[in-house]
């Protein structure tokens, strides 16, 4: 089994003798994930817990939650759920934050209930296809290297809690085959059919064209993102050292004079990573290019406003960043 082989290669992904919390929507990807994890449960001595987030986005939300709950009870799988307030999930970003907030709270609760089987892993059903969609979307928006390495296999989201995506080695066609082979129920989310949403348009219209031209294009795009991830980690380490070298007199500043002595591409890497370490969550490659151009040698003092009430300003000697909320 492919997942079992991957877990043997990287034992830290899903440690044995622990509780793992699966985010299950009821769609084909999450149901395939649930089946694969349940099959490996006894071998790895896992306590498997299910969490379902009811966004109440459509008329079938309640029915999906109830049917999924009954299916889990029938199969002796522990089930948990939360219902969202409409204000909490007004858009996809808020909905994602709501899901992770509730998943983290549930993981902490499960750990407190069983200290011998702590819940240190939260699993989602993201696949290679999801990763390819994200790469295409970020490329179209304009991104730096970090934007091409999103949807990592594992990342820490809270102290002692990692978000793990075991299905990145599968594409969406393969998760559908798993569901068919094992006669698993699938609950369709109507919101995934709305092509006015960017990701859905990529999923329904763009990726199928790429896959028809180059069979398995989604998996190969995801594979490129995986290879770039390693390169990106090396770049971050380099940037950390470079930022220390270019540190200004104040903690929220960089020496503009030191930046002058570096190449254009290195300056952009330093600026991008510095802004992220200072708390700027949304920054495009075009914005980095604009900042880099405006702070280059012989350019006059100035300022630029960024997302999240951040302000970058510069004079002859240094570049500063501040936030109105601080």
Curated annotation (Swiss-Prot):
E.C. numbers: 6.3.4.19
- Name-wise, this protein is tRNA(Ile)-lysidine synthase
Q: Where's it mainly located?
A: cytoplasm
Question: What would be an example GO MF term here?
Answer: ATP binding
- The superkingdom of the source organism is Bacteria
UniProt subcellular location: Cytoplasm
Q: Which CDD domains match?
A: TilS_N
Q: Which reaction does it catalyse?
A: cytidine(34) in tRNA(Ile2) + L-lysine + ATP = lysidine(34) in tRNA(Ile2) + AMP + diphosphate + H(+)
Family (UniProt): Belongs to the tRNA(Ile)-lysidine synthase family.
Pfam families membership: ATP_bind_3
Q: Which UniProt keywords apply?
A: ATP-binding, Cytoplasm, Ligase, Nucleotide-binding, tRNA processing
| Top class in the EC scheme | ligase
GO biological process terms on file: tRNA modification
Cellular component terms per the entry's GO annotation: cytoplasm
The entry marks the following residues as binding ATP, namely: 25-30
Task: Show the domain comment.
Answer: The N-terminal region contains the highly conserved SGGXDS motif, predicted to be a P-loop motif involved in ATP binding.
Matches recorded under SUPFAM superfamilies: Adenine nucleotide alpha hydrolases-like
In the UniProt record, what gene is named as encoding this protein?
tilS
Q: What is the lineage of its organism?
A: Bacteria, Bacillati, Cyanobacteriota, Cyanophyceae, Synechococcales
| Function recorded in the entry | Ligates lysine onto the cytidine present at position 34 of the AUA codon-specific tRNA(Ile) that contains the anticodon CAU, in an ATP-dependent manner. Cytidine is converted to lysidine, thus changing the amino acid specificity of the tRNA from methionine to isoleucine.
């Amino acid at each position: 089994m492919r997942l079992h082989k991957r877990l043997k290669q990287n034992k830290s992904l899903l440690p044995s003798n622990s509780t793992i919390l699966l985010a299950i929507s009821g769609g084909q990807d999450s149901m395939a994930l649930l089946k694969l994890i349940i099959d490996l449960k006894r071998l790895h001595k896992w306590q498997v817990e299910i969490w379902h987030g009811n966004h109440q986005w459509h008329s079938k939300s309640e029915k999906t939650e109830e049917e999924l709950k009954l299916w889990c009870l029938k199969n002796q799988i522990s089930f948990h759920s939360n219902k969202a307030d409409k204000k909490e999930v007004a858009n996809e970003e808020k909905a994602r934050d709501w899901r992770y907030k509730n998943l983290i709270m549930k993981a902490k609760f499960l750990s407190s209930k069983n200290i011998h089987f702590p819940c240190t892993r939260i699993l989602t059903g993201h696949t290679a296809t999801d990763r390819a969609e994200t790469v295409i979307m970020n490329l179209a928006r304009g991104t730096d290297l970090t934007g091409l390495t999103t949807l990592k296999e594992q990342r820490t989201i809270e102290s002692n809690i990692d978000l793990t995506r075991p299905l990145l080695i599968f594409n969406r066609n393969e998760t559908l085959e798993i569901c068919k082979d094992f006669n698993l129920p699938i609950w369709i989310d109507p919101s995934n059919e709305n092509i006015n949403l960017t990701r859905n348009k990529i999923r329904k219209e763009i990726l199928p064209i790429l896959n028809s031209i180059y069979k398995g294009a989604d998996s190969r795009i995801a594979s490129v993102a995986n290879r770039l991830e390693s390169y990106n980690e090396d770049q971050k380490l380099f940037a950390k050292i470079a930022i220390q070298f270019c540190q200004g007199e104040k903690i929220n500043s960089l020496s503009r004079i030191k930046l002058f002595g570096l190449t254009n591409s290195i300056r952009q890497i330093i600026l991008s990573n510095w802004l992220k370490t200072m708390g700027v969550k949304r920054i495009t490659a075009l914005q980095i290019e604009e900042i880099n151009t405006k702070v280059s040698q012989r350019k006059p003092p100035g300022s630029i406003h960024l997302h999240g009430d951040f302000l970058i300003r510069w004079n002859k000697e240094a570049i500063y960043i501040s936030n109105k909320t601080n």
